[in-house]
């Protein structure tokens, strides 16, 4: 037996939690920022320490240590008992818009009755009560008086913020069903690299397997689902930024799959000596031309292009891909890279801005988990993948041995990176 006074791993975790919580608390008090409360219906979406690197590091340390301590003290069966009811309950709340049926009132108000909420939906009072009381066990809604519901920070966000509803809807309606079908997809199509042979395609199957469709094909036929997906991808990109403007951009830059051009607009404002071309499919290019600021029209242009087709812009200085390759398996990613080669001049640079998968244990578990989650999502949705530094280099070598690795630069906390390759024929 260990002496009671001996420091153990669990006590060290607890001490870390206390020490780092004190740092977070001191920062919030010094900045006159509100302390986190479950009943704060005006709580910000961003972490309370997001604007200070030291305080944010302490906050992450608290979260990581707390999760590890909880896992240790809960026993080995706890991680195996996945709480499927949480996903189902949350999907039901979003589907029936229950959060919006609860009034956004001050914390000392009695709230909205279960009966009143039910009257705003097609559900019975009994069902509403059971659903919301289930959510309350996870700090989503609260019951300040018997039979009455008030918002917590989480439910208030769900009520007032349409983007949050879109994100939750995408997770519960699209990603969760796709993830459930991953075992069947892997059994049906072992080692497939095709985007229409996935958990998503099985979850959305209609008719025979000959009618299998990729996520892109499904969204082409459903404007609302496509809209929601687009909103969520914008949120993901803003949540994992990279200071692209700090890199050198000069000469002619081609942003391949660049959407409506927002990344290029920002770069063009800061790099006055560079010219930019944004490439994407026809509808997206048309939208981008309408959004192009007048002051940039002499240096930014749009070109219709499918990145599997030969690159039409020849002899550019930089060809740029942002969050493109993770949607595609190695087979198709190599095809995209090879479509560039006929257009490349000696010394041309290919820059990739993507999530960089860390080595096991290289980053805090909370951060690594984000990368692993994204990688599994790519498997379930598209047979795509997130890649580490070595895999990026192997991918470009597979496309051609004339690509030389230039650099790999990351930004805290270490997930997002820019990887550059130079064409040396």
Curated annotation (Swiss-Prot):
Conditions for induction: Expression is up-regulated more than 10 fold in toxin producing cultures.
Function recorded in the entry: O-methyltransferase; part of the gene clusters that mediate the biosynthesis of AM-toxins, host-selective toxins (HSTs) causing Alternaria blotch on apple, a worldwide distributed disease. AM-toxins are cyclic depsipeptides containing the 3 residues 2-hydroxy-isovaleric acid (2-HIV), dehydroalanine, L-alanine which are common for all 3 AM-toxins I to III. The fourth precursor is L-alpha-amino-methoxyphenyl-valeric acid (L-Amv) for AM-toxin I, L-alpha-amino-phenyl-valeric acid (L-Apv) for AM-toxin II, and L-alpha-amino-hydroxyphenyl-valeric acid (L-Ahv) for AM-toxin III.
One MF annotation (Gene Ontology) recorded for this entry: O-methyltransferase activity
Top EC category: transferase
Pathway the protein contributes to: Mycotoxin biosynthesis
GO biological process entries: methylation; secondary metabolite biosynthetic process
Entry keyword annotation includes Transferase: yes
Name assigned to this protein: O-methyltransferase AMT9
Record bears the keyword Transport: no
Gene source species: Alternaria alternata (Alternaria rot fungus)
Miscellaneous comment text of the record: Gene clusters encoding host-selective toxins (HSTs) are localized on conditionally dispensable chromosomes (CDCs), also called supernumerary chromosomes, where they are present in multiple copies. The CDCs are not essential for saprophytic growth but controls host-selective pathogenicity.
InterPro entries registered for this protein in UniProt: COMT-like (IPR016461), O_MeTrfase_dom (IPR001077), SAM-dependent_MTases_sf (IPR029063), WH-like_DNA-bd_sf (IPR036388), WH_DNA-bd_sf (IPR036390)
Gene name per UniProt: AMT9
């Amino acid at each position: 037996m260990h002496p009671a006074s001996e420091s153990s791993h669990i006590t060290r975790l607890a001490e870390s939690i206390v020490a780092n919580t004190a740092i977070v608390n001191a920062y919030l008090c010094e900045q006159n920022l509100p302390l986190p409360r479950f009943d704060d219906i005006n709580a910000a979406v961003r972490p309370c320490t997001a604007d200070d690197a030291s305080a944010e590091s302490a906050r992450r340390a608290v979260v990581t240590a707390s999760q590890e301590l909880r896992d240790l003290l809960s026993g080995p069966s706890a991680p195996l008992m996945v709480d499927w009811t949480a996903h189902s309950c949350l999907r039901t709340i979003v589907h029936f818009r229950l959060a919006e049926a609860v009034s956004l009132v001050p914390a000392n108000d009695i709230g909205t009755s279960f009966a009143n909420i039910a009257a705003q939906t097609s559900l019975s009072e009994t069902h509403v009560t059971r659903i919301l009381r289930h959510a309350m066990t996870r700090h989503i809604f609260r019951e300040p008086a018997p039979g009455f519901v008030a918002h917590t920070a989480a439910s208030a966000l769900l009520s007032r913020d349409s983007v949050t509803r879109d994100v939750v809807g995408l997770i519960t309606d699209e990603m969760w069903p796709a993830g459930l079908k991953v075992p069947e997809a892997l059994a049906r199509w072992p080692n497939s690299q095709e985007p229409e042979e996935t958990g998503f395609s099985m979850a959305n199957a209609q008719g025979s397997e000959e009618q299998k469709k990729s996520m892109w094909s499904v969204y082409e036929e459903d404007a609302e689902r496509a809209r929601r997906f687009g909103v969520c991808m914008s949120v993901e990109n803003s949540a994992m930024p990279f200071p692209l403007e700090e890199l050198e951009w000069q000469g002619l830059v081609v942003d391949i799959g660049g959407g409506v051009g927002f990344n290029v607009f920002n770069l063009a404002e800061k790099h006055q000596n560079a010219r930019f071309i944004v490439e994407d499919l026809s509808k997206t290019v048309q939208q981008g031309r309408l959004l192009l600021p007048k002051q940039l029209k002499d240096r930014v242009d749009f070109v219709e292009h499918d990145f599997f087709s030969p690159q039409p812009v020849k002899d550019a200085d930089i060809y740029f891909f942002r969050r493109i390759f993770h949607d595609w398996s190695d087979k198709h990613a190599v095809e995209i890279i090879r479509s560039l080669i006929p257009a490349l001049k000696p010394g041309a640079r290919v820059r990739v801005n993507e999530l960089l998968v860390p080595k096991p244990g290289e980053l805090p578990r909370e951060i690594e988990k984000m990368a692993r989650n994204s990688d599994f999502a790519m498997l379930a949705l598209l047979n795509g993948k997130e890649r580490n530094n070595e895999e990026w280099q192997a991918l470009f070598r597979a496309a051609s041995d004339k690509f030389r690795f230039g650099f790999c630069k990351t930004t805290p906390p270490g997930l997002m990176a820019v990887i550059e390759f130079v064409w040396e024929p």
